From Swiss-Prot:
NCBIfam families: PRK13694.1. GO terms for molecular function: DNA binding. It comes from Azospirillum brasilense. Belongs to the UPF0335 family. InterPro entries: GapR-like, GapR-like_DNA-bd. It comes from the Bacteria. This is UPF0335 protein pRhico085. The keyword Lipoprotein does not apply. Keywords: Plasmid.
């Protein structure tokens, strides 16, 4: 293999190994997150609601407000408001 080919192969191998390490870390983090959800559930918190809160916290404030307004409009249209 030429020097250029060896360099490209080395870089490719480096990228693949980095991705593999990150995938392993990601897997470990997902297990940690799962444990935290289990702990919260064991304490009496509703995990579905916690997941919704986390999703909402990731959103921009304007997007959250828009989503809430649309939800309220749909609830009214379906006669679900009190």
């Amino acid at each position: 293999m030429s020097d250029v080919g060896e360099i490209a192969a080395d870089r490719l191998k480096s990228f693949v190994e980095r991705i593999e390490r990150l995938e392993e870390e990601k897997s470990g983090l997902q297990e940690d997150i799962k444990e935290v959800y289990s702990e919260a559930k064991g304490t009496g918190f509703d995990v579905k609601i916690i997941r919704q809160i986390i999703r909402l916290r990731k959103m921009d404030k304007a997007d959250r407000q828009e989503q809430r307004a649309i939800l309220e409009m749909y609830e009214e249209a379906l006669g679900m408001t009190e």
